[in-house]
Amino acid sequence: MAGRRAQTGSAPPRPAAPHPRPASRAFPQHCRPRDAERPPSPRSPLMPGCELPVGTCPDMCPAAERAQREREHRLHRLEVVPGCRQDPPRADPQRAVKEYSRPAAGKPRPPPSQLRPPSVLLATVRYLAGEVAESADIARAEVASFVADRLRAVLLDLALQGAGDAEAAVVLEAALATLLTVVARLGPDAARGPADPVLLQAQVQEGFGSLRRCYARGAGPHPRQPAFQGLFLLYNLGSVEALHEVLQLPAALRACPPLRKALAVDAAFREGNAARLFRLLQTLPYLPSCAVQCHVGHARREALARFARAFSTPKGQTLPLGFMVNLLALDGLREARDLCQAHGLPLDGEERVVFLRGRYVEEGLPPASTCKVLVESKLRGRTLEEVVMAEEEDEGTDRPGSPA
């Protein structure tokens, strides 16, 4: 008996395996940056007990790097002297921008002369938004790839020096806004170009993480915080995690118009209320429209699926395409026809769609949209530089008295 008790006691019951947590729809695994890949925050020291320096480089690209890349034929065509026919091409100090170089373990930190101070970093972001992002003679995918790389270098320079939270936030805000605009401008064929949409999405998420950690440290003021907290929610529309994080913000901050509208958009998206959702999307300024653009195709597909369930009959029921154009903020009848045909719905002439039972299908990703109505038209003559550097989203709105 005692032997049996000892044998039984030596084998305690094996604990049940923990259930895996489901991944949030707006945070796919490939877009969650691992801690080892995240750039350090602007105030985090790379080595304990070391005081971070302040950069002293006055140029967008240090002279030593310009000379090295010139010798090695590693200058981008956006960085060479216009019309230069030399071999190798000569770097233009007014156009060359420091490229991103991943910090290696054991490698000494760059000296202050190789780091750009926050004022130069902000001027660099302004240049990227105003001159490079607006380039009309270069494919948008190539522009996005160049801008994204140079913005990574901006954030790394910021992380390697002792910048204050207020000035760091201004640089992070401008960099993130620039990245959102160039990503939104990518066309349907961007996946075949030099810009990788998955990597760009991960970089946007990292940008939001760095900026929101800067806000969370409490040192301010941060006048654009309501707008950028709203951008975070719009970019992660439908994410339970993102909504939870926003709802943890102080009530005074959540009461600001940019965040109130972002919360309303998120609620309409969750409820599947297409009419309310697209009415709200049409009222958003340009930058929030860039942030939410990645969800427009899925929202339109969900709305079309609801139409198919409601209107489909064995003999077919028709609906004017003009109704869909207005309800879903499409760019015209042609886009409405393309949307219906991409989901297996036949057309009756040029202006009506037929909902036949069993014909609606979903294959692959929703068709890409130019989003002229929902995004491009909202520039209203403004340049990207003006949108990125100005407080467009906060104009005429109340700001929280104390976000702490």
Curated annotation (Swiss-Prot):
GO CC terms: centrosome; cytoplasm; nucleus; protein-containing complex; spindle
Residues recorded with modification Phosphoserine: S402
Subcellular location: Cytoplasm, Cytoskeleton, Microtubule organizing center, Centrosome; Cytoplasm, Cytoskeleton, Spindle
Sequence ranges of Basic and acidic residues compositional bias: 87-101
PCI domain location: 203-379
GO biological process per UniProt: cell division; centrosome duplication; spindle assembly
Main location: cytoplasm
InterPro entries xref list: PCI_dom, SAC3/GANP/THP3, SAC3/GANP/THP3_conserved
Annotated spans, Disordered: 1-58, 77-117
This protein's UniProt keywords: Cell cycle, Cell division, Cytoplasm, Cytoskeleton, Mitosis, Phosphoprotein
Start-end of Pro residues biased regions: 12-21
Pfam family, one: SAC3_GANP
Family: Belongs to the SAC3 family.
Function: Involved in centrosome duplication and mitotic progression.
PANTHER family: 80 KDA MCM3-ASSOCIATED PROTEIN, SAC3 DOMAIN-CONTAINING PROTEIN 1
Subunit-structure text: May be part of a SEM1-containing complex.
UniProt name for this protein: SAC3 domain-containing protein 1
Organism per entry: Homo sapiens
Source taxonomy: Eukaryota, Metazoa, Chordata, Craniata, Vertebrata
